[in-house]
Structures are given as C-alpha cells and as structure tokens.
Amino acid sequence: PAVIPSEYFNTILYTGDDQTGKSITGVGFQPTFSWIKEMQGTAHHVLHDAARGATAGRISSNRTAVEDATDSMASFNSDGFVVGSSAAYINSNNASIVAWNWKGGGAGSSNTEGSINTTKTSADTDAGFSIMTYTGNATEGATIGHGLTKAPEVVMTKKRDATGGYMVFHIGNTDA
C-alpha cells in the first residue's frame, strides 16, 4: 500500500494560553518526535521525543549536555501532546505556535543490530523515520542499529553527556 504522508508527519498551529495541562490535538496520530516553535519573535525551537521521554525537552540552539526545556511537555497522547508545567517556549500566552510532528514507533526499545547497541530505538519503517538514544564508543566506522529497512538519508545527532552542537548528515551533501 502507498504511504500517506499525513499519517506519519503533520503540522499543527495553535495559540498559547500559558496554562499547564493544555491539550494540543489534531495531529492525527501519537507523535514520537515534536519540533515546536513560536512563530513570532526570538523564542527557541524546542524538541521533544518519546525515546528520551516527552518531558525531556531540548532547546535546539543550546550546546549544553543536559535537557534544558524539561517539563515544557507533560506527555504525548493519541492525537497530539499535553503541555507541561514549564511551558514558556511551547505555550506562551497569546503566542502563535507551530508544532511539526513525526510518528515513529512509540517509546522504543533497545536495538543490537549495530556495533553500538541503542538504549532506545523508535522506528516506523513505513515512514522511514527512526529516533534513538545510544552511548558512543569513539570508534571510527562504528554502526548503530536504526530499525529501518534501508540506510537513513538524513541523520541528526546531539551529544547528551557533553557540551556540543548538533551534527547533521544528508545523503545529498558530498562535502566533508
């Protein structure tokens, strides 16, 4: 059967109200990864995923090792997500907000397919989407089981135990 993109990726627009427990619905599935941003101003991009747990938000521009937007999301639900108690970036009063949502395989489980085992891998082979957590081993050529049926075309990584920025690989980028 053909893949219907809206069953695996959906964008939601909503207006913030600065209230804990606000349900954001209309996604059409339970997200595994949500990238959220106020559309005006200089507010940060905030990333939440099911592999690390919905409450473990990351501000994409920060280089810190720790989760830095914790509790801005309380949970993922069957049609979206619930805003948490520290929602400055994803539910500011009267802010126009966009949430890009991807469907994966839920909270995930360990994966031993590569030379580095993952702690959690949440993959949806129909969508070609996977998100995982793992501990690197500083070995050139190491592989990580991603749960997909073919090699990923886009990869984004971020250290969780040390300061540093994101690294992004795209199949079309042939420059080092």
Name each model feature, range by range.
Residues 1-176:
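Surface-exposed molecular-recognition determinants
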